[in-house]
Amino acid sequence: MDAYQQYIHKSRYARYLPSEERRETWKETITRYIKYWGDQLNDDERVEIFKAIHDLEVMPSMRALMTAGEALDRDNMAGFNCSYIAIDSPRSFDEMMYVLMCGTGVGYSVEEQYISKLPEIAEEFHATDTVIHVPDSKIGWAKSYRELVSLLYSGQIPEWDTSRVRPAGASLKTFGGRASGPEPLVDLFKFTVRLFKGAAGRKLTPLECHDLCCKIAQIVVVGGVRRSALISLSDLSDDALRQAKHGAWYNTESQRGLANNSACYTSKPSFEQFLDEWRSLYESKSGERGIFSRAASQKQAERNGRRDSDRDFGTNPCSEIILRKSQVCNLSEVVVRPEDTAESLRR
């Protein structure tokens, strides 16, 4: 490994060994990963895969390489790179929070066909004696947020108790990294209350859903470093999303910086529609919105012949994987070098 590769390994994938007060070596990281799969591999496969990873000929799921062990046992989602969800239920928001806290990227859609399924919000709000007690865990944060959203839909504004959440900077011994403390979660709770109160008596708009998703991603940090990955799909005709990153949005709606935005084309647009979208992209000075063609993804699925091509596909944040609603994906790599042959790459 060169110096840069060593840095990436030590800072991203090497687990800390408390008993030895150091991080894993590259060999120890691979050993932990191979050992995790137990009897799913025979002895010959273990030897071959270990050598291939060690010599940088292949890379396995890097999410699993990081979390294999107790962390992956506790949160299976942590083994996946990315996912896709349609915002069509109040539960979509807390599910997204949990997935992001596991380090998995999220593609999501706020197209009208999905967000129209959300319920209407109460016409009036009032404070209640209900207290949401937030546990100190990923699933605990997500469940607490689900409770908040549920109460807000019925017009109830609860209190919350985050005293059990470990302070900022505390070591996350199982998952690795440092705790963010309760402050980001409290910020999200307050943001959510304001947003729901502003939508009293109606359904959330696509832009409001988008902002809520971005704010959820904004709180998912480890050691103060952002680690959420998002892509937001919206209707081609949605002018509010088209304008979401125009002007000085970063001063007033900074959470929007957490997501890449793309218009979802369900059929070939007219020349005028296409030109309008590109003009908007240029005028925004942010390079957004991008373009995601659902029609093209359906054609690709049909060409592959491995799944139902009539589904309304979405995508992962990098937009290279076609995904169904609630589907996850993973990435692995074969490193091609000049001395490789077709036979060596196929082994």
Where are these regions (language model features)?
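Extended catalytic cores of very large enzyme megasubunits
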Residues: 1-347
